[in-house]
A protein has these predicted regions:
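N-terminal secretory signal peptides and thylakoid transit peptides that target proteins
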Residues: 1-15
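Non-catalytic beta-strand/loop surface segments
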Residues: 23-66, 90-126, 162-216, 240-287, ...
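Short pre-active-site segment immediately N-terminal to the catalytic Zn-binding motif
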Residues: 66-72
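Active-site SXXK
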Residues: 74-88
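M16/insulysin-pitrilysin zinc metalloprotease superfamily fold
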Residues: 86-90, 121-152, 303-304, 327-385
Length: 448
């Protein structure tokens, strides 16, 4: 889940009242109007011009995320995201706010495992100053001890609020660690308090030198602009930024296969009702099964008409809330189903029914109507995202980071619509039924 500088929105979509799409009615969506080039310093530039747009979205995607946190510095990529809003050699702190909010625009940022993204939207005639500001903080960030202490405090309080104070914060934080034994995906994006407190100014400077460089970034600009103007401004402001001669460190950890099923128990204070989870490892976002796993996830928990909600909440009254997610990242992924018990329901019973209903997808494929509805939901969500410049830029960025190809944003829509019931049953058998899993029981008690 993305961690933002100012806010974190976790949206669980309800079932959409949409007409079903028969396979013959598959949509043909025009591809993104993409133009791209690379500067001599390695910066990748992607332009998505739209003559009808009155605004422009500027996004800088740095290929550094929580998986790249230095040893003993969990949460550092996220902490650094906050520090990028401090001053630079030629730009006082809060300048990004003045260049966006003061002209009716907005800005924000988020950090996930594979990437850190800075995104702004302004009226189209304010594009060049924003490009200057992004190049300036890429090249000349300056952070002092007071700024580090201030932003560290913000992030520590974020951890307290989202993980320690939330009755189920520890529960959801534990799921990645259950999926991975050695890959840094097992760490939380926000980090641990002791690691955050250990960060130093030297750490900050080294991190910026190592990862915040033109050859580790993609600049995506979408909206109302002329491509020739954009190319001239990008060269003017980003062209002089030098790329270090040192290589960029990359995570090369290969997760060993899980040999057996495991069961874990986690206790935490102030847990009003027990919760359970089942966690499997999954392939990465570029895998051929990614679209089918996305469809399978939506069939299981995509709103109130989904299989898990119907079986555990509406019909049997075993759970107050359920979910299932296919979190497919660049290197690998996880599949996780979870449920929060209804009053008086033993965790063991809830876990058994959760497992049975999840694995039933491998035995009973979706009906034509069920599959068409889910495909319509997912396709509609993707099309709604593309209605704005910011949404089109973000779709392109995710394709670039997770699949290594910006054009995969277009193929993804066709791949979703091509998923069949047999595909869903096949991936459920391969990645759920035949795969090893970890079962978690979460209860009230003293933390271990």
């Amino acid at each position: 889940m993305p961690v933002t500088r100012r806010r974190l929105l976790l949206v669980v979509p309800a079932a959409l009242a949409l007409p079903t799409l028969a396979p013959a009615a598959a949509l043909r969506v025009p591809p993104l109007a993409l133009q791209s080039w690379r500067l001599p310093n390695g910066l990748q530039v992607y332009a998505l011009p739209d003559a009808a747009a009155a605004t422009v979205s500027v996004q800088v995607w740095y290929r550094v995320g929580a998986k790249d946190d230095p040893p003993g510095r969990s949460g550092f990529a996220h902490l650094f995201e906050h520090l990028m809003y401090k001053g630079t050699r030629h730009m006082p702190a809060e300048t990004i706010d003045r260049l966006t909010e003061d002209v009716g625009g907005q800005n924000n940022a988020f950090t996930v495992d594979d990437v850190t993204v800075y995104h702004s939207e302004v009226p189209a005639n304010h594009l060049e100053p924003l490009l200057w500001a992004e190049a300036e903080r890429m090249a000349h960030l300056e952070v002092d001890q007071a700024s580090l202490d201030s932003e560290r405090h913000v992030v520590v309080e974020e951890y307290r609020e989202r993980v320690l104070a939330d009755p189920y914060g520890r529960f959801f934080e534990a799921l990645p660690a259950l999926a991975f034994d050695v890959h840094p995906y097992r760490r939380g994006v926000i980090g641990r308090i002791d690691d955050l407190r250990a960060a130093t100014l030297d750490d900050v400077r080294a991190f910026h030198r190592t990862y915040y460089r033109p050859d580790n970034a993609a600049l995506i600009v979408a909206g109302g602009f002329d491509v020739a103007d954009l190319a001239r401004w990008v060269q003017r402001h980003f062209g002089p930024v030098e790329a270090p001669g040192t290589p960029i460190p990359r995570v090369a950890v290969v997760e060993p296969p899980r040999r057996r099923d495991e069961a874990r128990r986690l206790a935490a204070p102030h847990v009003p009702l027990p919760a359970v989870a089942l966690v499997w490892r999954a392939p990465g976002a570029a895998h051929r099964d990614a679209a089918a796993l996305q469809v399978a996830s939506a069939l299981l928990a995509g709103g109130h008409s989904s299989r898990l909600h119907a079986a555990l909440v509406r019909e049997r009254h075993l759970a107050n809330a359920v979910g299932f997610g296919a979190d497919l990242r660049a290197d690998a992924g996880t599949l996780a189903g979870w449920a929060i018990a209804a009053g008086g329901v033993p965790p063991a019973r809830l876990l058994g029914v959760l497992a049975a209903e999840t694995l039933r997808l491998a035995e009973k494929p979706p009906s034509a109507a069920e599959l068409a509805k889910v495909r319509a939901q997912l396709t509609t969500a993707a099309l709604v995202e593309r209605e704005t410049p910011a949404g089109r830029a973000e779709a392109l960025g995710w394709a670039l980071v997770l699949r290594g190809d910006a054009h995969a944003a277009d193929r993804a829509l066709d791949e979703l619509q091509a998923v069949t019931a047999a595909d869903v049953q096949r991936v459920a058998r391969e990645h759920l039924l035949r795969a090893r899993r970890v079962a978690l029981t979460y209860v009230q008690g003293a933390p271990g």
